[in-house]
From Swiss-Prot:
Residues 197-262 are annotated as: Interaction with UBQLN1. GO terms for molecular function: polyubiquitin modification-dependent protein binding. It comes from the Eukaryota. SMART domains: UIM, VWA. Disulfide bonds: none annotated. Residues 216-220, 287-291 are annotated as: Essential for ubiquitin-binding. This is 26S proteasome non-ATPase regulatory subunit 4. Residues 321-330 have a biased composition (Acidic residues). It comes from Bos taurus (Bovine). The gene is PSMD4. Component of the 19S proteasome regulatory particle complex. The 26S proteasome consists of a 20S core particle (CP) and two 19S regulatory subunits (RP). The regulatory particle is made of a lid composed of 9 subunits, a base containing 6 ATPases and few additional components including PSMD4. Interacts with NUB1. Interacts with SQSTM1. Interacts with UBQLN4. Interacts with UBE3A. Interacts with UBQLN1 (via ubiquitin-like domain). Interacts with DDI2. The 2 UIM motifs are involved in the binding to a multi-ubiquitin chain in a cooperative way.
Length: 382
């Protein structure tokens, strides 16, 4: 990389108050100087940059230094005043370059001219010949008063370059929103192949210079916007899904709580309606009640697992089920099998046998009674 010491000459005349460059010429110049300083120091860490004003006394604000922060802090203290003296400012910058510490550094002057140059063309050409002899390159950014200055400054740069030289440049920038953008794409900051000296991919949005490839920069910007919209949509969907899951979990908890409450109430009602005074019952009545409770418990479990939509149909069939249950309870063989499977119950116990016998005799009587009623109904029909 080229080792270079650069003096930046800034225009601080009254013309810099104009607003043809946003927000003013002076502030647009500050942004451009910022880019120049960073470009020079990043291209080579050993490069040095100094700062000098062109108006009135051509004051040297900072001598050659690699500290861009120091340069920029001095730059922001500059206020518009008076008129520029272009030739004097260039001579002072040349003297500052002669006192550079690194004698192997090439010398370069970058001058911002935003005011009319009052020096005549002969003086400019004479100064250019002297600088060429000293091997000093000069880059000029001509803006704001390009109609007045372009001819003089072109003669100055052409004299510096000679017939074959290309070390010095003149960049004329028409009024526009950004002086810095025009400078980035200019030969002053462009190396071989158009690469920006000291400006990596991180200095441009999406890593692409919009002036070098505007179509690619636009495509990347559109793609980035679409990606941002997709991410926002996915975030909204995820938030909605999380809210829906939370709502389902809450509803499920409420449903389970309601079911548990209903079951508890049903069990309490069942206990109140079906719990007689066991102390007043005989042993045979207690055994019969135990068998009845086991049957009712089975029916209760089946009723809890049944579909709620069939409740009306179940209500209409309750008399039939009660008759079937009564018939089952009066079946001695079924009761005998139930007693044999009950733990701690001896089917051969005398009390159990007596209870079974009484149930059997009752069943026989009921059967005969039902038969008589059926015969009587048939006779009435005849």
């Amino acid at each position: 990389m080229v080792l270079e010491s650069t003096m930046v000459c800034v225009d601080n005349s009254e013309y810099m108050r104009n607003g043809d460059f946003l927000p003013t010429r002076l502030q647009a110049q500050q942004d451009a100087v910022n880019i120049v300083c960073h470009s020079k120091t990043r291209s080579n860490p050993e490069n040095n940059v100094g700062l000098i004003t062109l108006a009135n006394d051509c004051e040297v604000l900072t001598t050659l230094t690699p500290d861009t922060g120091r340069i920029l802090s001095k730059l922001h203290t500059v206020q518009p005043k008076g008129k520029i003296t272009f030739c004097t400012g260039i001579r002072v910058a040349h003297l500052a370059l002669k006192h550079r510490q690194g004698k192997n550094h090439k010398m370069r002057i970058i001058a911002f001219v935003g005011s009319p140059v009052e020096d005549n063309e002969k003086d400019l050409v004479k100064l250019a010949k002297r600088l060429k002899k000293e091997k000093v390159n000069v880059d000029i950014i001509n803006f704001g008063e390009e109609e007045v200055n372009t001819e003089k400054l072109t003669a100055f740069v052409n004299t510096l370059n000679g017939k074959d030289g290309t070390g010095s440049h003149l960049v004329t920038v028409p009024p526009g929103p950004s002086l810095a953008d025009a400078l980035i794409s200019s030969p002053i900051l462009a190396g071989e192949g158009g690469a920006m000296l000291g400006l990596g991919a991180s200095d441009f949005e999406f890593g692409v210079d919009p002036s070098a490839d505007p179509e690619l920069a636009l495509a990347l910007r559109v793609s980035m916007e679409e990606q941002r919209q997709r991410q926002e949509e996915e975030a909204r969907r995820a938030a909605a899904a999380s809210a829906a899951e939370a709502g389902i979990a809450t509803a499920g908890t409420e449903d389970s709580d309601d079911a548990l409450l209903k079951m508890t109430i049903s069990q309490q009602e069942f206990g109140r309606t079906g719990l007689p005074d066991l102390s007043s019952m005989t042993e045979e009545e207690q055994i019969a009640y135990a068998m009845q409770m086991s049957l009712q418990g089975a029916e209760f479990g089946q009723a809890e697992s049944a579909d709620m939509d069939a409740s009306s149909a179940m209500d209409t069939s309750e008399p039939t089920k009660e008759e079937d249950d009564y018939d089952v309870m009066q079946d001695p063989e079924f009761l005998q099998s139930v007693l044999e499977n009950l733990p701690g119950v001896d089917p051969n116990n005398e009390a159990i046998r007596n209870a079974m016998g009484s149930l059997a005799s009752q069943a026989t009587k009921d059967g005969k009674k039902d038969k008589k009623e059926e015969d009587k109904k048939e006779e009435d029909k005849k």
